[in-house]
Amino acid sequence: MVEDHKSRRKFLILGGATGAAALAGCVGGSDDSNSDEAGAGLEGNGNGGNGNGGNGNGGNGDGNGNGGSGDSMLRDDSEFDPNDPGWEENNYRLSAIVENDYIRGRTEDLEAMGEQDVDEVAHGNPLPEPPEDESELVDPEPLVFVDQPGEEGEAQYQDNVQPLLDRLEEATGKTVQWEPVSSYAATVEALRSGRAHIGNVSTGTTAFAVNLADVIPFAAGVQADGQFGYRLLAITRTDMDEIQSVADFPDYNVTHTEPASNSGHQAPSALFDQYFDVTPDEDFEVEFSGGHDQSAIGIAVGDYDCGPICSTCIEDLVNSRDDIDFEDYKVVWGSNPFPPGPIVHRYDLEPGLVEDIKSVWLDTDWAGTGYEESTGYADFVEIEYKRHWNDILVIQRYNEVEYESGNL
């Protein structure tokens, strides 16, 4: 159950426009059809307990449960409605989530995030202002871009990122170097130290980068079909019939990914409390796996029973391996979409250089390039930190996150 101090903080999520929109209707889809607000991650799935009773009480009409066994809430993939999954009554295999394009959000969601009525940053420092003393402005040579290679590995990623590096050199007239790192914490440190000038950070670590490294987030990626971002999914194995809701998690071995991860820890810590009255570290012991891949694999092989995960991360992992399938996982809840990790630049770069850097992402069609192949993004759109990241910052405020390097 929720401690009093958590209960007092609930209004921080529900009191804002996004939280109110989330409660307005049980939409479950990639946008909130009952509101102009996006409500990223603050899904209005109704009532905390959400249908965790009736484990194995007969069949559900699709062959998944009969004779007193099976998950009576598990539906056939064909029954999934991305506009209204009805999580309080339904579970689905991960294959249904993927096949119905529920992994990401839509352009309308991203636009609504940017239209939120937000006066100031919800948690932490506002964006840093450029130095008033022009002598403190930086015009680096070479220009260093820091990023974390994806599943394809460092060598393949370097080939795929080369079109970006070439475009940066063309736009800025500078030599551009790519610095690969093994974690987002290393990305933040490279930017903080001034060793790197541009970078790609994750959604959850964006506020750490702003507060610790004095960066400005300016662009987020969108796929060619207009989809963007990712969702928080609460997953288990398909054969775990007894787990039908996040409300069932306290009885099982739950894994989170990393402390600073938005979908892997920060968001579920707030939203599981909000919608299921389940408080991580109070109702169950949080065991960190070390990352989304580790959580997904650990659940598949039985090291863990269930946990939160980033939708695009598990999609990429399953697509990259032959030993696990989408049908191996069951989804018992999904959030509204979160924005993807942004592109950032240090605050103290020469203004003209900043404009050249922005143009590379915002004015280039990346369709058909290796960069699109690696990132999944054909286009990048301009973002405003205090608005597009408002819901993430509200979640981090709820969790009383302190922006210190030791918390990354």
Residues of each region from the PLM?
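Terminal disorder- and signal-encoded targeting elements
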Residues: 1-183, 193-197, 203, 207-208, ...
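Short helices/loops that flank or line small-molecule/ion binding pockets
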Residues: 185-199, 212, 247-248, 292-312
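Extracytoplasmic "Venus flytrap"/periplasmic binding protein-like
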Residues: 213-221
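Domain-level signature for soluble enzymes in the chorismate/prephenate branch of the shikimate pathway
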Residues: 219, 241, 259, 287-301, ...
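A conserved helix-loop-strand patch within extracytoplasmic ligand-binding domains
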Residues: 220-275
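Active-site glycine-rich loop that binds ribose-phosphate moieties when present
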Residues: 270-274, 280-281, 288-292
